[in-house]
C-alpha cells in the first residue's frame, strides 16, 4: 500500500534522539532563567543570523508579542499583509495596536511596498512584513519608503530560518525579527521561537525581553526576585532547545535540498501561477494557484498527496472584519494551494507530485 506523501515532515535522526535522552536523564527540563541548552541555542542562532542578539521563546507567536511590546503601539497603526497566519495580526491587537492590512505582490506573496506607501501615515508605528514561504521581502524598498516617518520594521520571519536578503541572513537586517520553530518548520522543534535584535542598546533590550518572557521576573538572586512590569510564561524549554541545536547544524543543508525541489517544481509544473525560484529563499512552503481549489485538492488527496491552504486572508475572519480590506489578497487566498516540499521527499514522490498536478490542471 502506497503511503501518503506528507505536506510537512521533520528531518530527524539518532542525533536528536540522543540529545533528548540526555536532557531527559539530566532532570533539567526547563528554566525560566534560560540557561543550559536554551542559552547555547541563543548564542548559536545569534551567530548564524549574524544579529546583535537573540532571545529564545516558546513560539513564533510569543516572539511577535514580545517584539511588539518593546514599542508603544497602543492606538497606533501597524501595517502588515493579510496573507499570513493569524498570529501576525493577533500580536498587534494584543499590544493595543491597530492592524492596517496591505496588499501583497502576487508573484512573491510578500508585502507590496507600493501598497505600504499608499497607507503610510503619521499614525503608523510599525511595518510588519512577512517573508512568506521563506521568500525574502523587499526590505530595502520598505526602508526607503519609511524615511521621514517615526516607523520601525519588525520582521515576521516565521517561515524564514535560513533565508537571505542582499547576501545577509534574515535576522540581521531590522530592529527585530521573529522566528518560529515547530515540527513543520525548516528548523524543527516541538515548539519554539526566537527574536533577533539589531540595536546599539541590544544588551538592555535583551534584559527586558528576558524578564517579559518569564512573567516579568527580574533582579533574581537565589529565591528572591522582583517584578517591575508584567510578562508572560514564554520561555523555551530544554528539550526544544536541544533539538534546535542539532537542527541548526543541518539547516543550510536541508534548505539547499528544499531549493533543489523548488527548482524542479518551477521548471516542470505546468502552471502560470506558481512560486518563483529564488536562490535566497528557504522554501518553507511552495505554493501554486488553481481556480477550483476544492476539486483540485480532492483529486490530489485521492492520489495520496497532502496539500494545504496557506492561508485564509486574515481580514476575512469575523474578528478582523472591522478593519480595512485587501481584496486582491482575498482572491489569491481562495486559490492558493501549498504542496509538499521537504528534504524527506524521494525522487519518485517529487515526480508523482508534478505528474498529478499537470494531469489535473
What are these regions (language model features)?
Residues 160-166, 173-285, 315-318:
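Active-site region of PLP-dependent enzymes
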Residues 283-291, 318-324, 334-346:
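Conserved PLP-binding active-site segment of the aspartate aminotransferase-like
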Residues 20, 45, 63, 78, ...:
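Generic structural signal for small/hydrophobic residues in well-ordered secondary structure
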Residues 70-148, 152-157, 164:
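PLP-dependent aminotransferase-like
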Amino acid at each position: 500500500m502506497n503511503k501518503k506523501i506528507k505536506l510537512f515532515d521533520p528531518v530527524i535522526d539518532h542525533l536528536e534522539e540522543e540529545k533528548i535522552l540526555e536532557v531527559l536523564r539530566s532532570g533539567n527540563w526547563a528554566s525560566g532563567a534560560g540557561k543550559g541548552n536554551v542559552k547555547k541555542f541563543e548564542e548559536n542562532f545569534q551567530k548564524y543570523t549574524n544579529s546583535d542578539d537573540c532571545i529564545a521563546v516558546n513560539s513564533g507567536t510569543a516572539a511577535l508579542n514580545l517584539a511588539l511590546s518593546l514599542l508603544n503601539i497602543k492606538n497606533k497603526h501597524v501595517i502588515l499583509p493579510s496573507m499570513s497566519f493569524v498570529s501576525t495580526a493577533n500580536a498587534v491587537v494584543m499590544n493595543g495596536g491597530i492592524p492596517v492590512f496591505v496588499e501583497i505582490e502576487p508573484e512573491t506573496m510578500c508585502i507590496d511596498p507600493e501598497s505600504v506607501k499608499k497607507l503610510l501615515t503619521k499614525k503608523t508605528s510599525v511595518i510588519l512584513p512577512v517573508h512568506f514561504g521563506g521568500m525574502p521581502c523587499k526590505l530595502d524598498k520598505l526602508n526607503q519608503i519609511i524615511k521621514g516617518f517615526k516607523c520601525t520594521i519588525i520582521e515576521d520571519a516565521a517561515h524564514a530560518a535560513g533565508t537571505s536578503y542582499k547576501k545577509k541572513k534574515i535576522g540581521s537586517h531590522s530592529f527585530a525579527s521573529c522566528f518560529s520553530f515547530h515540527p513543520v518548520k525548516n528548523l524543527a522543534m516541538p515548539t519554539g521561537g526566537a527574536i533577533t535584535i539589531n540595536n546599539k542598546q541590544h544588551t538592555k533590550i535583551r534584559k527586558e525581553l528576558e524578564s517579559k518572557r518569564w512573567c516579568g521576573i527580574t533582579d533574581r538572586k537565589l529565591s528572591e526576585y522582583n517584578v517591575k512590569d508584567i510578562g508572560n510564561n514564554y520561555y523555551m524549554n530544554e528539550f526544544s532547545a536541544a533539538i534546535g541545536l542539532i537542527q541548526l547544524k543541518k539547516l543550510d543543508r536541508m534548505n539547499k535540498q528544499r531549493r533543489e525541489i523548488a527548482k524542479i517544481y518551477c521548471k516542470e509544473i505546468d502552471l502560470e501561477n506558481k512560486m518563483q525560484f529564488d536562490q535566497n529563499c528557504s522554501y518553507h512552503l511552495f505554493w501554486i494557484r488553481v481556480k477550483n481549489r476544492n476539486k483540485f485538492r480532492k483529486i490530489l488527496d485521492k492520489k495520496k498527496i497532502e496539500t494545504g491552504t496557506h492561508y485564509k486572508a486574515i481580514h476575512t475572519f469575523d474578528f478582523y472584519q472591522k478593519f480595512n480590506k485587501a481584496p486582491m489578497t482575498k482572491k489569491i487566498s481562495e486559490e492558493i494551494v501549498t504542496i509538499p516540499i521537504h528534504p524527506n521527499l524521494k525522487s519518485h514522490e517529487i515526480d508523482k507530485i508534478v505528474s498529478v498536478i499537470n494531469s489535473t490542471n
